[in-house]
């Protein structure tokens, strides 16, 4: 069954299953853009299918923890009736922050695939290495970064460029 195309990247054709799922996360990020939210999208995959979708909702909900990853984990746990998501993988457009990395560990996500690296606050490998430094948990999260990195980074860059342009017009 064909899915709708990305609005920002209509010619993007996924080369494999991982790119296909990241494209779904990109579509979620586009929903965030429509709400003037930071363009971060996330999908959790279970049994080779998208299980839940989420995007940033911090401004919309007025809640600092409504990051795409935390919202997706919450949806998946409610849908499964369990906090253990060990047979699930996460695809997110930006390297998770410390809070989200902690939630990923606690929910026992099997593997995280992220798009753009986050040099200012990325907690998977850019600024911190949360998946490898938190001890005392019986779960180790695997990860792979840089999946459709160019597109994911472009969304972030364009979003913040547009904010600067908008803010400069206020002066």
What is the role of each PLM region?
Residues 1-33, 99-171:
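Zinc-dependent deaminase
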Residues 12, 16, 38, 59-67, ...:
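Residues at secondary-structure transition points
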Residues 25, 29-32, 42, 52, ...:
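Small-residue (primarily alanine) positions within well-ordered alpha-helices
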Residues 36-40, 86:
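Short, basic and Ser/Thr-rich N-terminal targeting/leader segments
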Residues 40-48:
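Short beta-strand scaffold segments in enzyme catalytic cores
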Residues 51-58:
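Short beta->alpha transition motifs characteristic of CBS
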Residues 58, 92, 116:
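Residues that line or immediately flank small-molecule/substrate-binding pockets and catalytic motifs
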Residues 62, 66, 70-107:
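Helix-adjacent hinge/juxtasegments
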């Amino acid at each position: 069954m064909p899915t709708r195309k990305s609005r920002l990247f209509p010619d993007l054709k996924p080369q494999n299953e991982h790119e296909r799922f990241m494209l779904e996360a990109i579509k979620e990020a586009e929903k965030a853009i429509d709400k003037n939210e930071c363009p971060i999208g996330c999908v959790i995959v279970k049994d080779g299918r998208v299980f839940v979708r989420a995007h940033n909702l911090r401004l919309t909900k007025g809640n600092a923890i409504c990051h795409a990853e935390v919202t997706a984990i919450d949806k998946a746990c409610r849908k499964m009736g369990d906090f253990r998501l060990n047979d699930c993988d996460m695809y997110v457009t930006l390297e998770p922050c410390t809070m989200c990395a902690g939630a990923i560990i606690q929910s026992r996500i099997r593997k995280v695939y992220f798009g753009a690296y986050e040099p200012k606050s990325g907690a998977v490998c850019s600024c911190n290495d949360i998946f490898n430094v938190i001890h005392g948990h019986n779960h180790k999260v695997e990860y792979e970064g840089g999946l459709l990195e160019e597109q994911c980074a472009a969304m972030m860059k364009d979003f913040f460029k547009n904010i600067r342009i908008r803010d400069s017009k206020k002066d």
